[in-house]
């Protein structure tokens, strides 16, 4: 589990009480210039982080990540520009905080009691458990007593603290080491590639990386769930800290924090090794035949999202046919195809073009009150279920005091469309809402796999090209079949 167990009401209440308690220590009340004043005068909020799919990443210069989005919203709340400062390891993060080179750390950091003499933590925004991982196919250890190999964790991480405690209290024979050169993500990748026996990771990051490296397997949970939090410098100046607590309270109250958690963690729960392995194989062997068509017809939709929709529909089989008569890569009904001008549903280009147009029409048809970054999930539910049934799910949500514009609220009501207790009172009647729920969740998981897998391939290709270029410089060819040194 990666979902936080503390209620958002509790987080908001604690944040409010802390803000009130800190009120006397805010420097501007005594005529002094505090940290918040300095940030506003500078016009920048400096946030140190670590690159990771969950925390902060960039694809084609477009930043994303749970911590990035949360930090961006905090900077907007303060009315300043966000400046992201990436670091390679956790020790560097805290050094930057000590040296006043950053204003806060937003890097998916687990609460670590050993850090409290140097820094203080903000409210938790989700929770994770620490897990020991190994490569699938090698013997699975059931406890630290079963380890037969090397355990390496990232230097400065909470995993170091955990292993120290376990060695002192329960496993005196436990041997492990820390790496300054490798990040936690890189160590997890090394385990998946068979280059390292074991490491520790947090459950959320592991769940995401398994979509790209399905050989990465969880041996056992090392800890119960622990809060993930931002870190601030220990100081008598509480101005920035108090502003952060006010910001968190607003995020909790308006549901923004819950929606961010849903966006990045709501779909990572279940993992199917065979399904993931099959999909990654299809990326290499089948997708190249159709990628240019997805790119050509995607329009305002990310072509990779359009591609994973097609995979969910047909596994990229242009001849696919269901018992209900839907056909082709995008599995269009005859009526839908006719309305889109698709004459041959099993023609790959016609099917992709038709599916893209249909999805964009659904996006435009949605109520304007639905947030921009959540509209696609509502549109996909309508694509699978029918637009009217999706509206029924929104009405059910509103009737139960949920937010009909929030995907995290509406998706939980989709299965109710097939329950006798609810569907007789809906406008459009019975629908297989549980299938629509799984449909959207599967697409989100496939999207994580496709985006991450392609990024890994690009990174490896760039590394290979750099090595080739370096070899070319050190051994230049000066004649046919000759090189310097021959």
Swiss-Prot record:
Q: Catalytic activity annotated for this protein?
A: Exolytic cleavage of the (1->4)-beta-glycosidic linkage between N-acetylmuramic acid (MurNAc) and N-acetylglucosamine (GlcNAc) residues in peptidoglycan, from either the reducing or the non-reducing ends of the peptidoglycan chains, with concomitant formation of a 1,6-anhydrobond in the MurNAc residue
One Pfam family recorded for the sequence: SLT
Please give the superkingdom of this protein's source.
Bacteria
Q: What is this protein called?
A: Membrane-bound lytic murein transglycosylase F
Provide the protein's localization: Cell outer membrane
Q: Which organism is it from?
A: Yersinia pestis
> Where would you say this protein principally sits, based on its record?
membrane
PANTHER family per the UniProt record, alphabetical: MEMBRANE-BOUND LYTIC MUREIN TRANSGLYCOSYLASE F
The positions making up the signal sequence are 1-21
> Which GO MF terms does the UniProt record name?
peptidoglycan lytic transglycosylase activity
Chain spans, region LT domain: 269-486
> What family, per the record?
In the N-terminal section; belongs to the bacterial solute-binding protein 3 family. In the C-terminal section; belongs to the transglycosylase Slt family.
Region annotated Non-LT domain sits at 22-268
Q: How does it sit in the membrane?
A: Peripheral membrane protein
Q: Which GO terms describe its cellular component?
A: cell outer membrane
**What InterPro entries does the database record attribute to this sequence?**
Lysozyme-like_dom_sf, MltF, Solute-binding_3/MltF_N, Transglyc_AS, Transglycosylase_SLT_dom_1
Kindly state which keywords UniProt assigns to this record, in alphabetical order.
Answer: Cell outer membrane, Cell wall biogenesis/degradation, Lyase, Membrane, Signal
Give its E.C. classification number. Answer: 4.2.2.n1
The UniProt entry's GO biological process terms, in alphabetical order, are: cell wall macromolecule catabolic process; cell wall organization; peptidoglycan catabolic process
Relay the domain remarks: The N-terminal domain does not have lytic activity and probably modulates enzymatic activity. The C-terminal domain is the catalytic active domain.
Instruction: List the PROSITE patterns.
Output: TRANSGLYCOSYLASE
Known SMART domains for this protein?
PBPb (SM00062)
Q: Where is the active site?
A: 313
What role is this protein assigned? Murein-degrading enzyme that degrades murein glycan strands and insoluble, high-molecular weight murein sacculi, with the concomitant formation of a 1,6-anhydromuramoyl product. Lytic transglycosylases (LTs) play an integral role in the metabolism of the peptidoglycan (PG) sacculus. Their lytic action creates space within the PG sacculus to allow for its expansion as well as for the insertion of various structures such as secretion systems and flagella.
Enzyme type, top EC level:
lyase
